[in-house]
């Protein structure tokens, strides 16, 4: 849940930063041209933030669904979806950093949190797979 809260706050922060951005200009053949017009910049940030917002909040939602699963198959499915979303969040965080929307300190902090979630979920999913395999061996 705490990771989802961080993602929401980061989303709000980045969108506010983008909304306050000023265009940068360069001169080409004596004409002043906007290198990165604000609407284009704002749209880029919004798209990336939206992707992180979706994957980052989906981790907690799927984890809650797994915790309250109605069957073992449902628990397994939701756990693996949560892992997939956590890995996707790492991708979006990395992309935001590589494109200059997150500074090194912001990146390292939230990336470490997402990585920790991935490790926890990998452990859970491995355990689920081992239990499933053990039950299949018992049936034989």
Locations of regions flagged by a protein language model:
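Short, C-terminally biased terminal segments at protein or domain edges
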Residues: 1-65, 69-140
